């Protein structure tokens, strides 16, 4: 199904408010398997809204109008849609009863005739009740196009969508199921190049790459009527992806909200191992990230932060083992970021030294990083450290 979102309101065109409804509705439509092809904004003008509806009705199967349902003269959405469809406006009994209760409980407020407009719907519509306000919405199908009318205030729109509209859309629509693969150690452009043949021929399922700080994610999506049906398609696509040019070597986890440090935290908890950390050049960022990822789990024994001149690469093995024994941890991680003298403010060059001490021995790794700001380079150094620990666990 092809959908179009029409935001009605001059305040959107003049930049007085941001159209956050479009982002919310697009995301929810995607979850339902509804393809949103167009976002449109139009002012509070009947003629221009009629022209917009004329265009939308010819290129979309679903037209969602947001805003313009209030009691004032410039709230024209329902009236204009009724004119476009050649129908009348009628009162919805439930919405009118809610309006009655609202004013009955507020005797000091004057009920003017224009308030009644909020309880009107296009004749033949299925009313969409408003849990967070007074203006009723509606849904109607005519000539193969479904028209949906929603309020403009985001709190009302979200409540109406979730409680009134979503159950109706879910009855007949396939849903969009997604799976996120996370990769570290490969850039977005390289990943896209490796997967060019898969990307070029994609239909359903689809895949979309997203560059994050120091890593790349791939979102695999398919439309299906059940999770089981979706898994069959997503499993096949994932297998195809990971067989390309050793991409499995860069893949480390699933999930939109996952991360390298969360992966390390999970493995520490699974193995019931503790870790102590000494870091130089990262400002305590490693310890802060791990503490947050572990929450109240007792697998971070503690650590220390050493100043820029505190650790040189040759001392790391001793530092890692000392911190491990001092804090009685299973693992001791020592990280040192040494800035090279030729660095500039916007082009920091550094050597990152990583050492992990365990009861069975020492593992070490050196990485050259450069071409970034100092803040970004610190984040990358931490990612390298977590990937190093992950591969060692």
From Swiss-Prot:
SUPFAM superfamilies: CinA-like, Molybdenum cofactor biosynthesis proteins. It comes from the Bacteria. InterPro entries: CinA, CinA-like_C, CinA_C, CinA_KH, Competence-induced_CinA, MoaB/Mog-like_dom_sf, MoaB/Mog_dom. CDD domains: cinA. Belongs to the CinA family. HAMAP family: CinA_B. This is Putative competence-damage inducible protein. It comes from Streptococcus suis (strain 98HAH33). The gene is cinA.
């Amino acid at each position: 199904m092809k959908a179009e979102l029409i935001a009605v309101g001059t305040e959107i065109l003049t930049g007085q408010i941001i159209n956050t409804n479009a982002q919310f509705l697009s995301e929810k439509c995607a979850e339902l398997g509804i393809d949103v092809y167009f976002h449109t904004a139009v002012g509070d003008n009947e003629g221009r809204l009629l022209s917009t509806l004329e265009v939308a009705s010819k290129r979309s199967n679903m037209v969602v109008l947001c805003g313009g349902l209030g009691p004032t003269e410039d709230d024209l959405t329902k009236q204009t849609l009724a004119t476009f469809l050649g129908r009348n406006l009628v009162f919805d009994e439930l919405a009118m009863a809610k309006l009655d209760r609202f004013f009955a409980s507020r005797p000091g407020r004057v009920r003017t005739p224009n308030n009644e407009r909020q309880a009107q719907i296009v004749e033949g519509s299925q009313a969409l009740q408003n849990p967070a306000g007074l203006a009723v919405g509606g849904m109607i199908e005519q000539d193969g196009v479904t028209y949906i009318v929603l309020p403009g205030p985001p709190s009302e729109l979200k409540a109406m969508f979730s409680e009134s509209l979503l159950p109706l859309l879910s009855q007949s629509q396939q849903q969009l199921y997604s799976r996120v693969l996370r990769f570290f150690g490969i850039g977005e452009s390289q990943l896209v190049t490796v997967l060019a043949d898969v990307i070029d021929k994609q239909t359903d399922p689809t895949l979309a790459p997203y560059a994050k700080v120091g890593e790349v994610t791939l979102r695999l999506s398919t439309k299906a009527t059940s999770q089981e049906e979706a898994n069959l398609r997503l499993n096949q696509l994932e297998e195809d992806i990971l067989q390309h040019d050793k991409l499995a070597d860069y893949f480390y986890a699933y999930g939109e909200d996952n991360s390298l440090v969360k992966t390390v935290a999970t493995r520490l908890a699974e193995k019931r191992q503790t870790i102590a950390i000494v870091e130089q050049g990262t400002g305590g960022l490693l310890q802060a990230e791990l503490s947050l990822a572990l929450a109240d789990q007792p697998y971070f024994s503690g650590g220390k932060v050493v100043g820029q001149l505190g650790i040189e690469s040759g001392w790391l093995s001793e530092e890692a083992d000392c911190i491990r024994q001092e804090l009685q941890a299973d693992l001791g991680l020592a990280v040192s970021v040494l800035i090279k003298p030729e660095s500039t403010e916007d082009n920091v060059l550094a050597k990152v030294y990583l050492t992990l001490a365990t009861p069975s021995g020492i593992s070490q790794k050196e990485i050259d990083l450069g071409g970034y700001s100092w803040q970004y380079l610190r984040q990358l150094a931490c990612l390298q450290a977590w990937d190093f620990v992950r591969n060692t666990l």
